[in-house]
Amino acid sequence: MGSIDDSFSLPAPSDEHGFEALGTQLVEAMSTYAKCLKAENLPPPSLYPMFSASTSVACPEGIEAKRKIVELSQLICAATMDPELNLLISSLQFHFCSSLKVAIDLRIYEYIPVDGTVSLSQLAELAGRIMRVLTNKHVFMQIQPGHYAHTRMSSLLLKTKAKDLLSHRLDDVFRSASREADALAQAGYREPDRRAAKGFNLAFNTDKNFWEYIATDDPKRGARFARAMHAVNINSLDVIPRLYPFDSLATDGSLIVDVGGGQGQVAKRILEYYPNSGLRCIVQDGYVTNGSTAGPAAVEMHRHDFFEAQPIKGAAAYFFRHIFHDWPDNACVTILKQTARAMDKHRSRILICDQVLDDNSPAEASLLYDIDMMSLFGGKERSLAEWKSLIYSAGENLEIVNVLRSPESEAAILDVRLKL
């Protein structure tokens, strides 16, 4: 671990970050956001489930204002709260996670009508204690003492995909995270590598990585994980075809190899979005059977381990969605090397669809996803500087020539080519 530079000192508080100035900035951001919502005929933010579960503005000003509201609110709370109490409450947040898991396991959300309330007497005594924690976090609301109703958050639990994602996080990830500190200590507090034990290994008492474990030891857990991934909003299927002009690949041979592409859901969406482009897609995954899918957006399915030599040479694009963030740097270098050796230097590119963390103010969700990846896989979310360092360390004459970012999130596609 590096030594502390004694010459470093915190900057003096400025008027811009003064307490009242923060409040002024918050009011301004709320005003801007409200105007954008009104202009797009969207309802104002509310906890009530009758409003849209997701209030997403399209205009850049509204997106930025929404980000500022959340960021400033958290900053004001952190500055206002007693620091000892703040640390204490923060250290107890795992109880919220366990309470939420109990509510999901008991399916409490099914007993509450969407447009009504349920009394505590209709719930188990234990559930009442759990509900106190969850209403404090506005997952549910207490209309009057002992009577509970849905909020926009709890109403999401009525949707299977959201429930599966939360169940995965509150079980697989929660258990893994509880042992991550032990795993890091065991590794001497070094960056995880492919061979080091992760929090997952200690929590589940296995030498297998997560992927091997859910494929062989616990396929039921693996099926839930697959369902959960359909509920992830970062790099959603609808965003991907709009992030990159895939139809332009027609001039470079038209072939897209979707590496680690699961059942081909991304490849199919790309073909559906560009129906007359002449594109072809081959989906490679370690757990598929060789063959082809049916329908107008048909893709070829090939079994392949991306740590082995890439058998398809000179494709227009080797596409990786949510692959690199699952693996530590040394594993990613192996994947990049195997892919680069199959590329044609004039027409091939590697397209990496993952998060690119903002250097100055990364989203809180992205920072937590980073620890998520570390606990389960030893992976990480990366800033642009970290992506550049990773690509450079792979050698093979690779370089990032473009980064196409989503205006709505930290999702992005990195366009990586061979230097000419």
UniProtKB/Swiss-Prot annotation:
Class of the enzyme per the UniProt entry, highest EC level: transferase
GO molecular function: O-methyltransferase activity; protein dimerization activity
E.C. number: 2.1.1.-
Keyword annotations from UniProtKB, A to Z: Methyltransferase, S-adenosyl-L-methionine, Transferase
Name of a matching Pfam family: Dimerisation
Residues the record lists as binding S-adenosyl-L-methionine: D285
InterPro entries: COMT-like, O_MeTrfase_dom, Plant_O-MeTrfase_dimerisation, SAM-dependent_MTases_sf, WH-like_DNA-bd_sf, WH_DNA-bd_sf
Gene Ontology biological-process annotations: methylation; secondary metabolite biosynthetic process
Active site per the UniProt annotation: H325 (proton acceptor)
Protein name: O-methyltransferase penK
Organism encoding this protein: Penicillium thymicola
